[in-house]
């Protein structure tokens, strides 16, 4: 990514958000925490899955001034093709992310947080933009995800099956609870990088599916 962004002359700082607590994976809460911990010198964020790498240099990673820019659009993502999909790689100005109150913290386990975030984007009155003129189709990205790695995070437990389709109108960036266990700043192949080991907090009365078993 560093070579890719540097070639496009995009200044960047990579934040690796590593969940080190004993709860199930919560991508949205990690992104909320990463947003709060990121430097004030940044103008926008890239919510970028680590298992999705761009292969087409024509992809735009520039400042999404007009509104959220979904780099990994349904027409290009190798796996997810439904029209409301906004996962994988999404660029937002910090102002727009705050306008949405970030992402819902209720999604423990894999998936569905992006679908809820799509509704937040629309509810905030923002227009979603996607790439145009990209001719590489489903070969635009390299996708390294293997669901067998984290089987416990694929499960839908108890009321989670119903909750996953609801809109969280109260929680988000303003309510995420976490602590930073450690912070390491380093350079990887010349890329400026900060690794945050994050311990999330779970209200088990509200979301008992944060644990498994």
Tell me the role of every PLM-derived stretch.
Residues 15-20, 48-51, 74, 93-95, ...:
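Structured beta-strand/turn binding interfaces of compact recognition modules in eukaryotic regulators
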Residues 41-55:
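Short beta-strand-to-loop acidic/aromatic patch adjacent to the donor-nucleotide binding site
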Residues 29-33, 91, 116:
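Acidic, Ser/Thr-rich intrinsically disordered and amphipathic helical segments
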Residues 75-92, 99, 109:
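A recurrent flexible, glycine/aromatic-enriched loop bordering the glycosyltransferase active site
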Residues 55-79:
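Conserved donor-nucleotide/metal-binding helix-loop-beta segment in metal-dependent transferases, i.e.
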Residues 4-42, 76-78:
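Active-site-proximal specificity loops/subdomain of glycosyltransferases
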Residues 106-109, 115-213:
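C-terminal catalytic/acceptor-binding lobe
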């Amino acid at each position: 990514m560093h070579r890719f962004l540097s070639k496009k002359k995009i200044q960047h700082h990579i934040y690796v958000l590593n969940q080190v607590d004993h709860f199930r994976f919560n991508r949205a809460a990690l992104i909320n925490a990463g947003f709060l911990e990121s430097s004030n010198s940044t103008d926008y964020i890239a919510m970028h899955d680590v298992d999705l790498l761009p292969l087409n240099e024509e992809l735009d990673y520039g400042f999404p001034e007009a509104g959220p820019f979904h780099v990994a659009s349904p027409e290009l993502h190798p796996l997810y093709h439904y029209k409301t999909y906004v996962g994988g790689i999404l660029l937002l100005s910090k102002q727009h992310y705050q306008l949405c109150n970030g992402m819902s913290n209720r999604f423990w386990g894999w998936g569905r947080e992006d679908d809820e975030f799509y509704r937040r984007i629309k509810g905030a009155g923002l227009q979603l933009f996607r790439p145009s003129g990209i001719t590489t189709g489903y070969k635009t990205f390299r996708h390294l995800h293997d669901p067998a790695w984290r089987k416990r995070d694929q499960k839908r437990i108890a009321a989670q099956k119903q909750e996953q389709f609801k809109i969280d109108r109260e929680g988000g960036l303003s309510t995420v609870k976490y602590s930073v266990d450690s912070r390491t700043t380093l350079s990887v192949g010349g890329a400026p990088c900060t690794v945050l080991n994050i311990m999330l907090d779970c209200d088990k009365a509200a979301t008992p599916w944060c644990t498994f078993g």
